[in-house]
A protein has these predicted regions:
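A sensor for short, sequence-defined functional sites
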Residues: 1-633
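Cytosolic-side junction of a single-pass transmembrane alpha-helix
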Residues: 632-640
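Cytoplasmic C-terminal tails of single-pass
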Residues: 641-649
Length: 649
């Protein structure tokens, strides 16, 4: 395509360069895709960011041809094409998530790149994944967070192939021209402004202009395609067949017990690891192979589970979902709308959803937690549409700190921390504990607290009480603190302060003018309680606060009984986002909660007995177990969110 004059304001450019031209041409007749880019360097930082080229391809079914690499400087073209300088490197960006794709990158480092240069290069990738049976589906974005000088996108297709198009966020429509036996779909855009950065938005929120293209006419076509490449093995042999026979003999007519035993085997005895080369991006390996090797990705484990259940007479189907919870029902039918495989079983008249990639799940029989994945497509010839998955309430975290004081600053304070996890929170914690040594777990807990109380010491090993059938897990920590109080020598008073940061950290900051939803943890429910026992007694009036909204609930209760002070907090979210129309109200609620309701201090005087008061903005008493769970949840969230939609893991 001919390059147009760019109208980019360099004040809007980050990273020291911008795309002056971004061109993609897909030729379905030749089964190839041509790409052409021009990057203009505006600052010295751009030199660092533009001086290498990396092009991804899968050698199992694709071939790469690089046509030109040039630098334009002072109106003159400098040839930078050095084929021998290219290195072909394995590109396993998802290996840390235990997924191996077998894809590669052609990589070159360019010399003598300067501020003001324009780097231009183009290449063609021929071939496509055979798993799609020559059926085309894709999405193309016309907008990013940075401005782009010019965008050209086109598709050349035989007139015999019907392509369906759908535009999102006011994306432009194609110009369509038919010549002979070929149809050209063409988009040509001038300068495109960058879209606003949408930090803290839920994963499903996509504000960018894009077009979806799909050759699939309906969801039935997608379901049949997925079923045909992932048919269950109803009569497994070898080691798997032997294991199934042993289970049938053990459980007899106990169908529910047999079901849960099979689920446990697939979840806990077959580790998560995906080798997704070529067609195995969407096709599962044979269940007997997966069981023998004791590893597999989501579709491997799902098909293994379905096959084992079928072999004992329990009906089950493989299903595909999107872990970002995108509104699949609003999308064109396509396999690319999904990134994860799960299972739907029918056990004694009850529908039970299972994610076979989750290890360590508690509960008994059919009582098993299933994440909120929104919509699913059952891989069955009978499927006609996507269906809703159950919106189950998650588990809870109940966190209690018990402080027993001696009445004056000279006496040590004992601290006992009780944390009870239920449901999926227990599942998460169970996995975390299994990944850590007991010594490391105790070290991390005590290390955290010593940052608040430098002279804190552990008085006992951390107790872990796991009731797997009841799906609860409890931890108990015990410490002694010799520097609990802060002393004010001017008035002979000493004080102690608390702040419920585990509540505030789950309430993201925002302003009243956000035009897009804000992501919050969901499902999420936490109870946080502080007990302080003092022989001096308490003279604090009770306090009760309640905030009920459509998206969340918060409560705070303060009371005293004899020598015991109790402060109880509760926070629960009812959905995964704060809608734009709710943001102003949420921002006001958050300010009130974090400024006025989460902190408490008390003071004792060595001269005049005891006095107590509430206060705010004191110090942060963070809970290490909550930190652990938050970090663990974030790791899983990122791992799932960053998945390539061209694969099912």
């Amino acid at each position: 395509v001919k390059e147009n004059e760019s109208h980019i304001n360099v004040r809007d450019v980050n990273d020291g360069y911008y795309l002056r031209l971004y061109e993609d041409e897909v030729n379905l007749i030749k089964d190839e895709a041509y790409s052409h880019m021009i990057k203009e360097i505006t600052t010295d930082a751009g030199v660092q960011n533009v001086s290498d080229i990396s092009i991804n391809f899968d050698p199992l079914y694709e071939s790469l041809t690089i046509h030109h690499i040039s630098v334009w400087r002072d109106g003159k073209q400098i040839d930078k094409m050095q084929k021998n300088a290219f290195k072909v490197l394995a590109n396993e960006k998802d290996l840390a998530m235990f997924v191996y794709h077998g894809s590669y990158s052609a990589y070159i480092i360019l010399d003598d790149i300067r501020k003001g240069d324009r780097l231009e290069y183009d290449y063609t990738i021929s071939g496509s994944n055979p798993i799609y049976n020559k059926k085309f589906a894709s999405s193309h974005y016309f907008q990013g967070t940075e401005p782009i000088g010019q965008i050209h996108y086109s598709i050349i297709a035989p007139t015999t192939r019907k392509l369906n198009f759908k535009s999102y966020n006011d994306a432009p429509q194609p110009d369509i021209k038919t010549t002979g036996s070929a149809t050209l779909y063409n988009w040509d855009l001038g300068t495109v402004a960058g879209a606003p950065n949408v930090s803290n938005a839920p994963a499903w929120f996509d504000p960018f202009q894009f077009v979806q293209i799909s050759e699939y006419g309906n969801w039935h076509e997608v379901a049949v395609w997925g079923y045909n490449i992932n048919k269950p093995n109803d009569k497994p042999n070898g080691l798997l067949g032997k294991r199934i026979s042993e289970l049938q003999e053990k459980y007899g007519t106990d169908t529910t017990g047999l079901f849960r035993a099979i689920v446990s085997i697939v979840q806990n005895e077959v580790r998560y690891m995906g080798v997704e080369m070529g067609p195995y991006s969407h096709k599962a390996n044979d269940p007997c192979k997966v069981y023998n090797q004791r590893y597999g990705d989501c579709k491997d484990k799902s098909l293994l589970l379905v096959s084992m259940l079928h072999s004992v007479g329990i009906k089950a189907d493989m299903a595909i979902v999107n872990t970002d919870k995108i509104k699949i029902e609003d999308y064109l039918p396509s396999p690319l709308s999904f990134n994860h495989a799960v299972t739907l079983a029918h056990v004694q008249g009850k529908d039970v959803w299972i994610d076979a990639t989750i290890a360590g799940q508690g509960g008994k029989g059919t009582n098993i937690y299933f994440p909120c994945y929104s919509k699913a497509l059952i891989l069955s010839p009978a499927t006609t549409d996507v269906i809703a998955t159950p919106e189950k309430h998650g588990g809870e975290i109940r966190y209690t700190e018990d402080y027993v004081t001696g009445g004056d600053e000279s006496k040590p304070v004992s601290l006992t921390v009780y944390t009870i996890f239920t449901g999926n929170k227990a599942d998460d914690m169970r996995t975390y504990v299994a990944d850590q040594s007991k010594a490391e777990l105790e070290k991390s807990y005590q290390s955290y607290y010593t940052k608040i109380y430098p002279h804190l010491e552990s008085t006992d090993s951390v107790a872990i009480i796991d009731n797997k059938e009841g799906d609860t897990l409890e931890t108990i920590e015990k410490y002694v603190i010799t520097d609990f109080y802060d002393r004010d020598n001017s008035n002979h008073e000493y004080s102690a302060d608390f702040y419920a940061s585990m509540i505030s950290r789950q309430m993201p900051q925002t302003d009243n003018n956000k035009k897009y939803p804000i992501a919050v943890a969901y499902p999420y429910k936490i109870h946080y309680t502080v007990h302080v026992i003092s022989p001096n007694g308490w003279t604090i009036p009770p306090k009760n606060e309640r905030i009920f909204r459509d998206a969340y609930h918060f409560s705070c209760d303060l009371e005293t009984t004899g020598n015991k002070l109790s402060i109880d907090y509760e926070l629960e979210y009812f959905k995964d986002n704060i809608a734009p129309k709710e943001i102003a109200e949420y921002a006001n609620d958050r300010k009130k909660i974090t400024d006025d309701l989460l902190s408490f201090s008390f003071k004792n005087s060595t001269d005049a007995g005891t006095s107590s008061s509430t206060n705010s903005n004191i110090f942060t008493a963070v809970v290490p177990v909550v930190i652990v769970i938050s970090l663990f949840a974030a790791r899983i969230y990122r791992a799932r969110r960053n998945r390539d939609r061209n694969r099912w893991y």
